[in-house]
């Protein structure tokens, strides 16, 4: 992978009819949105303080290959993964970025398919705060780096593959967001993933999206 940090490049969305998922709410309303098929967790430490767990729901029916990569890196089943890595880039009111499991500074990363793998699709958008998307260095350069949104960055739609949503632990995400950074958006205090893994989902459930 070439030198220099991976930059979040600007992202258009194509939502196929096959991606639509419906479920009945408690009051008989129909929820619309992608279905969570698996979950992963990150236990986070800032400096020497354990600050809690981030749980991310993953949309395996929409982007199965991207989800498979993320889950395998969370479990470490290939012998490498997110455990011990850090959030290396933090921009308040925009996003936090992590997943550089090779160099730790935003210039590296690797997927379970090889150094990089192609963009799977752009069926999901960056709908608001807490959505999880692949960081890249341009088209078809997905590896292990990812980011969690802290706004609704619609300009990233069509450029970065969205594959998950934080369903628990946004207080932890915001704790990372509030860390002081240097001139390169690197946190001055290490924000580390001290443990990670998979949480099985016995019954898939819908993350509701108003404009789905």
UniProtKB/Swiss-Prot annotation:
Cellular compartment(s): Cytoplasm
GO biological process, alphabetically ordered: protein folding
Activity regulation text: Inhibited by cyclosporin A (CsA).
Residue ranges constituting the PPIase cyclophilin-type domain according to the UniProt record: 41-198
Secretion signal span: none
Family: Belongs to the cyclophilin-type PPIase family.
Record protein name field: Peptidyl-prolyl cis-trans isomerase C
Gene assigned in the entry: PPIC
